[in-house]
Amino acid sequence: MSESTATREPPAFAVSKKRLRLLGLTLDDAIKVFFGGNAFVSVIVLALITIFLFREGFGFFGQNRQNLRIYRQAGLEYVDFIRTQTDDHTALTRYLSDLRLRQLSFFLQEKKLSLADANAALAAFDDFADRFGTAIDPLRAMVSDLTEQATEIKTKFIVAGDKREERRQLTAEGKTADAAAVKIDEVNFTNELKPLLATLPTYRAVNRELEQKLKGVLDTAPPPPTPELAVRFDRFKDLVQIYVAGFPAVEKNLETWDYLKSVPVSQAFTAFVFGHEWLTASFWQDWYGVVPLFVGSLMVSLVALVIAVPFGVGAAIYVNQIATAAEQKFIKPCIEFISAIPSVVLGFFGIAVLGQALRLLSQQSWLSWVPGFPYSERLNILTAGCLLALLAVPTIFTLAEDALNNVPRAFKEASFALGASRLQTIVKIIVPASLSGIVSAVLLGLGRVIGETMVVLLCAGNRIAIPDFSAGLAVITQPVHTMTGIIAQEMGEVVRGGIHYRALFVVGLLLFLLSLLINYVAQGIVRRYRISIG
């Protein structure tokens, strides 16, 4: 074969080069345009996503401000000042119920009494608890009446708004006669709120009566059977004193309350960013506070990282530094195959297998020392965190192994030449040299799990509440809801353009910005790592 024949280009390649020359482009120019075009498209897509989220969520804060304005003008805020008292009293009765349960356990386990005898021994405490619980009844009845009045005012306002919208639509369609026939009953808040505000003297009298009842009930409290329970009961008495001492502040709020006071734009923003309630489709008042959703996402992600980081980084170190070639060929595909499992399949696995298995494991007596064990909620932070860890391991493993591969071979050889063992070389040379890359792998793993939807929707428990951190490490056995889960759960039920619809888009925007921040920090660490290695 001649040299010219051996180096001859394939016909198709030659034709392509000819076409490029006709376009005035070289092959290098075409490659640059192709890959540069892909990067440009990525930027465009990112910009479009950002614009879309801002456009759909932009009107939320204005709508939320109007939502808070109605809450004030209709008197709901006024009633909630009083309702806080009844809610705090309910919390105190729950404390009493816990005290009774502890005393019952003492009589059954320590005194070896029968259930009937134990209940008989608690008769005086039950009478005390009953009198404490019924002391709030007059105030609770008053709150019920005020709730009906405020709800009626709010309903009138909403109906008037619906009528205005109906008239606007008819006018836009050119049906002026029909639009003029739509009757709108405007709400005069000054007149509507007069009966509500007139109840202030009655409230003061009910408050004084409640204060006297609570003090009288405390004076007749039976002594607890053990010193430990006596300490807890003294704490209950202190809480009641604090509760009663707060009555004048409630009265002051009612006296100075003004329905005409404007709601600043900043309050609509802070109510979302720092709000502790996410309550929709409520007959009373809808609240859009992202804190419980953000905390839920953060808790599940932290549990996932606590589990995934040791496994992912440990596996990367073993495969890269210790494993034989045969072990590498077996381990790497197995770990990377995990990322191919659909998240919904993992969610079903969590519901049917993992959640139940962890709950049964928590009920083993030899594990009673573990915080939160035993527990009854099989769908919780721990279950979702374990499954998310499984999703994060391939990401952390792959990126951490790449970081270990980029450590110059001379580092290892110099360490061995100085007499260091393999373990010493790994711990003191290889891992520190690749630490920046490992940290970036962990951050990208965090970005992977914090944006996961199906697993947390199916396995986190979907309770919209801030976990009780007073439980310590046992907090991971509590159910939560997450930002991704709330979007997936509620988006199909909302009215396009409504406040609930826009609130979900603002949650999505927050999640999007959070993921961008995590990835930006991770990429910055990678760049610094590459510079230091270079």
Enumerate the predicted regions with their spans.
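Membrane-topology segments of multi-pass transport proteins
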Residues: 1-34, 54-286
